[in-house]
Amino acid sequence: MIDQYKHKQLQIGLVSPQQIKAWAKKILPNGEVVGEVTRPSTFHYKTDKPEKDGLFCERIFGPIKSGICACGNSRASVRENEDERFCQKCGVEFVDSRIRRYQMGYIKLACPVTHVWYLKGLPSYIANLLDKPLKKLEGLVYGDFSFARPSAKKPTFLRLRGLFEDEISSCNHSISPFFSTPGFATFRNREIATGAGAIREQLADLDLRIIIENSLVEWKELEDEGYSGDEWEDRKRRIRKVFLIRRMQLAKHFIQTNVEPEWMVLCLLPVLPPELRPIVYRSGDKVVTSDINELYKRVIRRNNNLAYLLKRSELAPADLVMCQEKLVQEAVDTLLDSGSRGQPTRDGHNKVYKSLSDVIEGKEGRFRETLLGKRVDYSGRSVIVVGPSLSLHQCGLPLEIAIKLFQLFVIRDLITKRATSNVRIAKRKIWEKEPIVWEILQEVMRGHPVLLNRAPTLHRLGIQAFQPTLVEGRTICLHPLVCKGFNADFDGDQMAVHLPLSLEAQAEARLLMFSHMNLLSPAIGDPICVPTQDMLIGLYVLTIGNRLGICANRYNSCGNSPNKKVNYNNNNYYKYTKDKEPHFSSSYDALGAYRQKRIGLNSPLWLRWKLDQRIVGSREVPIEVQYESFGTYHEIYAHYLVVGNRKKEIRSIYIRTTLGHISFYREIEEAIQGFSRAYSYTI
């Protein structure tokens, strides 16, 4: 993502409260500081203008109309003795209205609030760092129990209040007067920690380097213990070791990114720019508003109520304050992720609110639909089909897609070769599909790679480069071996094709992204170009053969019978008779017989093979031995045949196979020979 400031990436992460305030804080020319949203109101019901310090305040987020303040004045109407940069009356700056797309605000929370992504996510980063069960942390955050602060030289009164309710209730008559005294607020703030503030204190006290050292020591101790023989204990030990590794990785990541763990607890809540959560007025006095506005309103109302109670803390009951803190926590949770508390929050019409997580995540979220899924020039999309005649680095582009992608290059070459005089005539030739257009198109495509992408692009092999070739039809042809990298199959999957324009992009595609350069998985190093799905079915059909074996010949179930030897172009060909399976002296003879439809693809046959000591030295007992009049004998085994003379010398060996096996073997042999030649060139 490149903008005018040359920012090349967008990163989501934790930021400090000071950074959030710096994003939203704005100092007006008169020295007034604005940026904090304190009111839940949006627009005034009479004037339809944004409320001051509300969610659409023009002082905080900028003017609705460019150069016009909330009073309706412009820079030209400012008096000579006044500052021309903003309106003295309403405090709105005379700037472009596009500032409302990126100017943020903030809400100063009356109590700390945990970020629900880091508390309830899987895995829970807060529970991982603190090494505590998630249920106990949730009970602490939502006020189910408290824990005592480690205050020096001061007595501790409560420790895990939720675990000592029975003991406290027995002394209720003597404790109740103490809790109702005005000094209890001071005692509570000194001795008791609850809510997200307690989590923040524990995170702030962490030393990440000590966490890494202690976790490493514990992991080594568990590793040295080995297996105990108790399946349950061994399983617990394995889970603990995995947890320690994740904890060390998380702490190391915090150190490397200069992020403090306590930033996972919010003190300031950012407010999105108003253009990203608009309110639209339709005909008939209908108002359509973003759900995020309603969720922000709920947070502000509950936060203001809590701030009011804290100001009157001497009169407000402690349970009421804790209940209000819980409501603020739940309101922020709903804003960030409405389904974090189980059932999603609904409005008065039983409609589920869309939280920030719902706006961001998924196929229709902000990233995949708006930022990553935008339509771009020099691209196309079509269904993929198998291209069995293609090389690994090739893809077949339909004529319709190819001429659209390379149209500008074809026009340039038409004018350069003086086939046309201007662009208009060149476009007419392309429209009329003249023969010279296809010739130039093939020349242009010969040295220009294309990029194929299948969504979702989950790893690096989701987009690869190919050399395009023209094919008939309207589908993109793809070599079946590259399907595993794309996680694609040929049941209707679609792929997008992109054209790299600059020389740098073309060089990167050739050197890094070509399919024959990505034969191994970048994650684990295993081969990624392996036969799958359609190829496996094709190889199975090619090599299935006859399952009845050699004994089928005795019952003539194959329909293959003895052959008479004929001299066909000086080659040893055998025609079928009605007794025996055919014999061939080479694979070329067998392929010739198949082309002449003398044999079938899976018909059993005998193929003369080179003398193999593994076959000769086999201790297998022959099924049958046949002798001829001149002393020649034939030893018939399950899968091969040995021909010898009367001196017991082996003259030839025949193996029992099918034409499918022969074709498969020839392909593998040619591939190995080609690899050997390429390897010898590199030495």
Swiss-Prot record:
Its cofactor is Mg(2+); Zn(2+). Keywords: Chloroplast, DNA-directed RNA polymerase, Magnesium, Metal-binding, Nucleotidyltransferase, Plastid, Transcription, Transferase, Zinc. It is found in: Plastid, Chloroplast. It catalyses: RNA(n) + a ribonucleoside 5'-triphosphate = RNA(n+1) + diphosphate. It is an enzyme of class 2 (transferase). Binds 1 Mg(2+) ion per subunit. Binds 1 Zn(2+) ion per subunit. Zn(2+) binds at residues 69, 71, 87, 90. Its EC number is 2.7.7.6. Mg(2+) binds at residues 489, 491, 493. One of its GO terms (cellular component) is chloroplast. InterPro entries: DNA-dir_RpoC_beta_prime (IPR045867), RNA_pol_asu (IPR000722), RNA_pol_N (IPR006592), RNA_pol_Rpb1_1 (IPR007080), RNA_pol_Rpb1_3_sf (IPR042102), RNA_pol_Rpb1_clamp_domain (IPR044893), RNApol_RpoC1 (IPR034678). GO terms for biological process: DNA-templated transcription. One of its GO terms (molecular function) is zinc ion binding. In plastids the minimal PEP RNA polymerase catalytic core is composed of four subunits: alpha, beta, beta', and beta''. When a (nuclear-encoded) sigma factor is associated with the core the holoenzyme is formed, which can initiate transcription. Belongs to the RNA polymerase beta' chain family. RpoC1 subfamily. DNA-dependent RNA polymerase catalyzes the transcription of DNA into RNA using the four ribonucleoside triphosphates as substrates. HAMAP family: RNApol_bact_RpoC1. This is DNA-directed RNA polymerase subunit beta'. It comes from Zea mays. The lineage of its organism: Eukaryota, Viridiplantae, Streptophyta, Embryophyta, Tracheophyta.
